[in-house]
Design a protein with these regions (language model features):
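Phosphate-backbone recognition surface of nucleic-acid-processing proteins
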Residues: 4, 9-108, 165
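Low-complexity, acidic/Ser/Thr- and charged residue-rich accessory regions of DNA metabolism proteins
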Residues: 41, 45, 78-166
């Protein structure tokens, strides 16, 4: 599954997933779509475009390497899924199964690096599906940020207002 170290940079890098109307929009945003050279009737696809957020693309590519392992719902994943809707859990399980199968199929024919990139592209589609499934009421409120400066403690709330605490 996608843990905090993968999810947090994605949410921070992409921002509001509602502005992306299709999973391909997220794939384009991350630069995970194949380049294309067309002329007349010929169409040749090349490597990924790499246009877009390189940090998020790297994070997803690293996460894609985990799909070479057999899918399972471990205790850690069960704990993370508590409180999630049944539909989100179903999407996550289908993603694990499909991406593992895709990685195995592609790595048998191509280099494993190319397989990981292709799986990262497909993983972006599943991330988009889950992000669209979570409604704003389901999304947790932004946490308070506590800062200290010269012995004083300040609290920054969700509205970005700073207040000194006692």
């Amino acid at each position: 599954g996608v843990q905090v170290l993968t999810g947090l940079p994605l949410v921070g890098g992409v921002g509001d997933f509602d502005r992306l109307t299709h999973p391909r929009s997220l794939m384009h945003f991350l630069g995970l779509t194949p380049s294309e050279h067309s002329s007349g009737g010929s169409r040749v696809q090349g490597g990924i475009t790499r246009c877009g957020n390189s940090h998020c693309r790297r994070i997803l590519t690293e996460a894609a390497w985990h799909y070479r392992l057999q899918p399972k719902v471990s205790e850690a994943i069960q704990q993370r899924q508590q409180g999630q809707s049944k539909k989100v859990q179903t999407i996550a399980w289908e993603a694990q199964q499909r991406l593992h199968k895709r990685f195995k199929t592609l790595s048998a024919k191509k280099k494993s690096v190319i397989a990981a990139t292709a799986v990262a592209r497909e993983l972006a589609g599943f991330v988009w599906a889950i992000a669209c499934e979570i409604k704003p009421a389901d999304k947790p409120a932004a946490p308070e940020i506590i800062r200290t400066c010269k012995g004083k403690v300040y609290r920054l709330d969700a509205n970005k207002k700073m207040a000194q605490t006692k």
